[in-house]
Amino acid sequence: MAKEKRPKRTPAEKARAQYTGYLVKEPMDLMGFLAAKMPDASRTKLKSLLSKRVVYVDNVITTQFDFALKPGMKVQISKDKGRKEFNNRLLKIVYEDAFIIVIEKKEGLLSVNTERQKERTAYTILNEYVQRSGKHHRVYVVHRLDRDTSGIMMFAKDEKTQHTLREYWHDIVTDRRYVAVVEGEMEKDHGTVTSWLTDRILYVSSSQYDDGGSKSITHYHTIKRANGYSLMELDLETGRKNQIRVHMQDLGHPIIGDGRYGGEGVPNPIGRLALHAFKLCFYHPVTNELMEFETPYPPNFKKLFLKQ
């Protein structure tokens, strides 16, 4: 009698099979939790898992052995124990699986080269990293952050995943938010800016009327006002080049450190563009699992609002 063939696993099933998952039921530190779940593993072995960045807490790579776990958190251990160590002062990897890499990049680092700019980028750094596991490996661009903007962004690890993310971006991404410090005290607590943006190569122009440019929509919420500044959260309905920077200029409150869009000649107390992509939430393009990534506001942003 012929053996019955097992049905092939779907990509989603294969992706989920790469991890062993545990639910946290009581408060404890990460090392204690791992020791309880893997009683035969030595402390050295457990520390090795952390240093190799194969342990995740709520989908974020965690290397801190005394990380405080709370009930309801999810701990995952990747079965890919051969992952290469990664240390780079310009970006850090916050999540990685067989299909995507989520990073936090520093200000000053280009996402991707343009024809006019031939220098080290997040794209080239990540390509060098994945090619340590195989020369045929590479990353694929999904979206970009401006050079002077810091924060969370995502790359795909294969062409099919890249296509899915680009084609269905607005369905897949549920929340994409930025924090900015702008000049002056914003008049409204919240509002929406709509304009048509045109890329003029050296700058992006904005029109309140349809002049053939790309319709662009930014929602804003004022978090705090103090010392002649406003701390803003910004939610992009569209994702055009320099969109937030241009829209803040349109409101008469340019972003601190933005010499291109309204901030020229104005003192810059933090020495950088005060714009950071702090939140990215999306449905995984293969497993359909909801992924949520968030970083704190940059400390130098918050310092501007301390009592003087």
Set out the residue ranges of the language-model regions:
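RNA pseudouridine synthases
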Residues: 1-192, 196-203, 300-305
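Short, surface-exposed loop/helix-turn segments at secondary-structure junctions
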Residues: 257-269
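Edge beta-strands of extracellular beta-sandwich domains
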Residues: 88-90, 255-259
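Short alpha-helix capping/helix-loop boundary micro-motifs
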Residues: 59-64, 228-231, 266
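The conserved catalytic core of RNA pseudouridine synthases
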Residues: 135-166, 175, 194-195, 199-251, ...
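Conserved hydrophobic positions within beta-strands
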Residues: 93, 182, 219-222, 255
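Short secondary-structure boundary/hinge segments and terminal tails
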Residues: 67-68, 266, 291
